[in-house]
């Protein structure tokens, strides 16, 4: 009886196994059993790191995470520039290059963990074909290396995530919320709005960026900051399917960072303005010379950026009008031009303040106060003002 049962079992197995073998999937191109059409073959996520205290990290960082469990691959594709830490001169000259780098996710997260910055993951709902196209596109950019000039607005971490995903989608388009499509803003305004926690970075940024960054941008072109990208993609969809698949997952726990110094650009500007007002009555020459020296140093830097630097968005800057070396060059003849020059500076302050009140950011209030202080220093050099003050005494 046992032999009969064993025989029947063997016959059953012999008939079942070929059936399984026939039904097993074999890839027609690669000849393996991995189904590359499966929706989970490749998964794509957006990784966003919290802002850091360093001036080059105050906006945070965004990159794309690509995973392929079948081949045990898990990489972050991060668009970055060459290190700025020890190359400030090259940065100001516009000589730094940018490129796409593939970094293992563990190494990427460990770097931010050491800095105390949080990292969040947002899984993307992309078509399977687009996910594989995206990986191919990213690999091609990695192979090119760091060959493109540094340009935060056109090749920053956030905007390149948008560009790569759009290229992978081909003819399919991301449908953005109407609030983004209807908003009018410049790249400079968008960036400065995210500098509230780091006032000194925002203060310096206004000196560095102008020109093209002060032109209105629309739609996805406004997504030049990681925080803006996340908010836009939360409301975006592809063919009616939400672009972000789920709530964010915390990969690295961090501590919120900000500049908590009590000495802010606004405080500095008020102190200098009060000093300029007081010096109208004190009439101390060393105050005039100190202000002239500071104005000349900043003006020379502005002239260098606009005339000689290849740094992006430095073709023109409205701060060049009050900050330039011309007053120092013609200081000996100041009695002839002091009054009209001071009037022009005050007109500049009025125009910039009006822009701010209307919501169009070109400079900050601290810059306006500094220019107002400088205009008072120059105004005091006018013979007409000197005569008026001497009569009052």
What are these regions (language model features)?
Residues 14-18:
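N-terminal signal peptide c-region/cleavage motif recognized by signal peptidases
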Residues 52-53, 117-125, 143-152:
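Second-shell loop/turn segments in exported
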Residues 19-23:
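Boundary at the C-terminal end of the N-terminal hydrophobic targeting segment
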Residues 140-393:
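Activation targets extended, charge/polar-rich intrinsically disordered C-terminal tails
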Residues 39-116:
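Glycine-rich catalytic cores of cysteine/serine-nucleophile enzymes that process amide/ester linkages
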């Amino acid at each position: 009886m046992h032999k009969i049962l064993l025989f029947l079992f063997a016959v059953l197995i012999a008939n079942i196994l070929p059936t399984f073998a026939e039904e097993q999937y074999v890839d027609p191109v690669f000849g393996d059993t991995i189904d590359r059409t499966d929706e989970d073959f490749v998964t794509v996520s957006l990784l966003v790191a919290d802002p850091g205290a360093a001036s080059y990290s105050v906006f945070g960082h965004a990159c794309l995470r690509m995973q392929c469990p079948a081949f045990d691959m898990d990489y972050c594709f991060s668009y970055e520039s060459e290190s700025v830490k020890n190359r400030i001169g090259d940065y100001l000259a516009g000589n730094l290059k940018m490129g796409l780098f593939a970094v293992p996710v563990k190494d990427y997260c460990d770097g931010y963990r050491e800095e105390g910055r949080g990292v969040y993951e947002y899984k993307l709902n992309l078509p399977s074909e687009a996910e594989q196209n995206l990986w191919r596109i990213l690999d091609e950019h990695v192979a090119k290396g760091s060959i493109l000039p540094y340009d935060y607005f056109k090749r920053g971490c956030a905007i390149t995530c948008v560009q790569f995903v759009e290229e992978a989608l081909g003819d399919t388009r991301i449908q953005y919320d109407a609030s983004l499509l209807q908003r009018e803003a410049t790249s400079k305004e968008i960036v400065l709005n995210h500098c509230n926690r780091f006032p000194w970075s925002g203060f310096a940024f206004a000196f560095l960026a102008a020109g093209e960054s002060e032109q209105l941008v629309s739609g996805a072109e406004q997504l030049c900051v990681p925080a803006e990208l996340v908010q836009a993609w939360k409301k975006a969809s592809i063919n009616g399917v939400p672009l972000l698949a789920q709530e964010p997952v915390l990969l690295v726990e961090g501590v919120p960072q900000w500049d908590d110094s009590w000495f802010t650009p606004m405080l500095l500007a008020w102190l200098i303005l009060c000093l300029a007002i007081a010096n109208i009555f004190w009439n101390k020459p060393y105050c005039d010379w100190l202000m002239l020296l500071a104005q000349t140093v900043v003006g020379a830097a502005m002239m260098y950026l606009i005339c000689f630097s290849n740094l992006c968005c430095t073709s023109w800057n409205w701060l060049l009008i009050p900050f330039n070396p011309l007053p120092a060059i013609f200081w000996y003849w100041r009695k002839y031009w002091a009054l009209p020059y001071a009037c022009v500076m005050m007109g500049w302050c009025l125009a910039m303040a009006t822009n701010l009140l209307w919501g169009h950011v070109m400079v900050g209030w601290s810059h306006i106060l500094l220019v107002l202080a400088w205009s008072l220093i120059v105004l005091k050099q006018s013979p007409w003002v000197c005569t008026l003050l001497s009569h009052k005494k």
